[in-house]
Amino acid sequence: MTATHNHYLAVLGEDFVAQQYANEGYDITARNVSFSVGEIDIIATSPQGEVVFIEVKTRSSSLMDAAEAVTPTKMRKIHRAASKWLQGKPFADIRFDVVAVHVDEYGELDMTRYQGVEHGAC
């Protein structure tokens, strides 16, 4: 796979996940937030006011489950980025979700959501 194909899949997956969360009443606060310590794909606020940091992994093959790509090291980077993003903001409950998106050969997408993931390796 090429870098362009991988980027296309990533954007496709992130758009799909953001729309699914929005359909469930979440406010999509930010996307692709990057700090020197790490990046967050999607930041959303739940209907209950909880800030949710969402890592999206998209795959078009089943060689490796997308969620397995979220290692403890990756989660540490996400936690650090979340800490940076939260600086100076009002206190809120937070949650870390990992969403694995699969794109089949017909371009159909489905997702598996892991809510409240703290250390990776769903």
From Swiss-Prot:
InterPro entries: Restrct_endonuc-II-like, tRNA_endonuc-like_dom_sf, UPF0102_YraN-like. Gene3D superfamilies: 3.40.1350.10. GO terms for molecular function: nucleic acid binding. It holds the Pfam family UPF0102. CDD domains: PoNe_Nuclease. Belongs to the UPF0102 family. This is UPF0102 protein DIP1513.
